[in-house]
Amino acid sequence: MYGIEYTTVLFYLISFVLVSYILKTIIKIMDYIIYRITFVIVVLSVLSNAQNYGINLPITGSMDTAYANSTQDNNFLFSTLCLYYPSEAPTQISDTEWKDTLSQLFLTKGWPTGSVYFNEYSNVLEFSIDPKLYCDYNVVLIRFVSGEELDISELADLILNEWLCNPMDITLYYYQQTGEANKWISMGSSCTVKVCPLNTQTLGIGCQTTNTATFETVADSEKLAIIDVVDSVNHKLNITSTTCTIRNCNKLGPRENVAIIQVGGSNILDITADPTTSPQTERMMRVNWKKWWQVFYTVVDYINQIVQVMSKRSRSLDSSSFYYRV
């Protein structure tokens, strides 16, 4: 009997020693693996210099939020300026190095060489369709031409504000404007827009829906027209479809990185009286028309005062911002 008890005690002692040895071996192996992995991670981190990304956080706010004026002294060292001008300007200047000359003059005002971009456009229509407002600050020179006051005024309303637009199919649907910020924008080489307001029975009010000659004309042979009709009333529309397009748009707010300089004209065109234009700092100004060199010299001289009433934006804006923006 004593032999059996000694054997049992000896078995448990051997088992305990064996288990202890196995556990110590496992711990040593785990320590070795952990130390190795830690060492590899540290070495790779030093060598890779990678960005550390955290968890995915929800994005709040809108890119179209109207930012406070961010222009500060010496801010131009890391800002870009786009200057837009009609094609008649370089034709009159007739100097192949005129842009280099202006770049050197802008340098004296704190704008480094390479930060100012010169962009030419042929006419109001071309610019309104595809403005390419890509810079931190965008200054547009518009030559005042008698007879085109309305096109210029509406171009100013278009590019000084953000618009959200959708195409309109006027052959299939009636349309109504839902508020003061809701407008119809037509563009083309010659836009004539006619409307017929409808009652609740879809019968014309003062017009016949089957006879476009009875429709009211709201735009006649214009390149750019921003149409405003009575809100909450359906309208049947008719346009010169071969030379014109029309879109249903909502004005979202001011596009604060754009300023317009009217060149010539007895009075400056004013769009701030529009009830859809929120109170804002005037970003449309006028300079006297003499010669294009004189105009550009004036712009260079006052460029820093001009951008002080603007706000730098962090993204590019082009025609998509008021056509199919989402």
UniProtKB/Swiss-Prot annotation:
CNP motif as annotated region, ranges: 165-167
Pfam families xref list: VP7
Cysteines engaged in disulfide bonds, as pairs: 82-135, 165-249, 191-244, 196-207
Region described as GPR motif: spans on this chain: 253-255
Sites where the protein binds Ca(2+) 1: 95, 206, 214, 216
Signal peptide: 1-50
Keywords linked to the UniProt accession: Calcium, Capsid protein, Disulfide bond, Glycoprotein, Host endoplasmic reticulum, Host-virus interaction, Metal-binding, Outer capsid protein, Signal, T=13 icosahedral capsid protein, Virion
Gene Ontology CC annotations of this record: host cell endoplasmic reticulum lumen; T=13 icosahedral viral capsid; viral outer capsid
Assembly description: Homotrimer; disulfide-linked. 2 Ca(2+) ions bound at each subunit interface in the trimer hold the trimer together. Interacts with the intermediate capsid protein VP6. Interacts with the outer capsid protein VP5*.
Record protein name field: Outer capsid glycoprotein VP7
Provenance organism: Rotavirus A (strain RVA/Human/United Kingdom/ST3/1975/G4P2A[6]) (RV-A)
Lineage: Viruses, Riboviria, Orthornavirae, Duplornaviricota, Resentoviricetes
